[in-house]
């Protein structure tokens, strides 16, 4: 293999640039040319493809976002769109592709594999919802962003004797809510993977009020429901002054943490190794601090699981 491509797709996550850097540098180290595909699968279809050199990835390891830009592309979900993408890859002489992104990005990579084109997926999403890896690129940075925000919100909550409902990202996964809630001592954590009873949540808050507790923090994953709705019901049923904060896209931005930079570097370099070894249709990951790879179809078919022991611990500590 003498020429490979790399693209980022779907929602951006801090550390994607570090992964791009690792792909480019590892490939060039092995004498392989690298082409960057801009705007994800949309850029693949349109042919927005440019050769990358060592200088192309200079001074980006610390930057959030992605220098290749990203986009969601409905056209690539069609057979015609996939054929256009493969035609562009052949036109540029690209023999293998590294795809950095989440499950939607991996679904696109799987389609390329089915058409006989070698791909390797690198998990990049703040949701940490990709099976086959303990952590995804960007999760640790987003977690620290959320923790910092909750720390600041708790300061004002204690000053005004208020209950705060904080909605964090996590459409189908509660990792951000669980980890940040546990780290910040939240009184209640609401995630998609665990049943929640609003009556029990209200009772817990009322017990706290009865023993003199003046403020509370409730962390809600967006996939469970609207933080605004939670806040409204809590205010109506407890009489507590309640405020709602939706953290939104601030969770995706910022300079990646050291952990995410190292993780992205390891996964990006491993993706190149796998392509050069002749592997195709796989994803890279890290399990027990060891680099691993799994069949991409298997990864897409598996359901994300959360550490329910950690969830139970959060409940035990928030009595």
Swiss-Prot record:
Keyword Zinc-finger found: no
A cellular-component GO term for this protein: 6-phosphofructokinase complex
Amino acids binding substrate: 125-127, 162, 169-171, 222, 243, 249-252
Binding of ATP, residues: 11, 72-73, 102-105
Catalytic activity as recorded in UniProt: beta-D-fructose 6-phosphate + ATP = beta-D-fructose 1,6-bisphosphate + ADP + H(+)
Stored Gene3D superfamilies: 3.40.50.450, Phosphofructokinase domain (3.40.50.460)
Entry's EC annotation: 2.7.1.11
Family, similarity comment: Belongs to the phosphofructokinase type A (PFKA) family. ATP-dependent PFK group I subfamily. Prokaryotic clade 'B1' sub-subfamily.
Stated name of the protein: ATP-dependent 6-phosphofructokinase
Species in which this protein is naturally found: Halalkalibacterium halodurans (strain ATCC BAA-125 / DSM 18197 / FERM 7344 / JCM 9153 / C-125)
Source species taxonomy: Bacteria, Bacillati, Bacillota, Bacilli, Bacillales
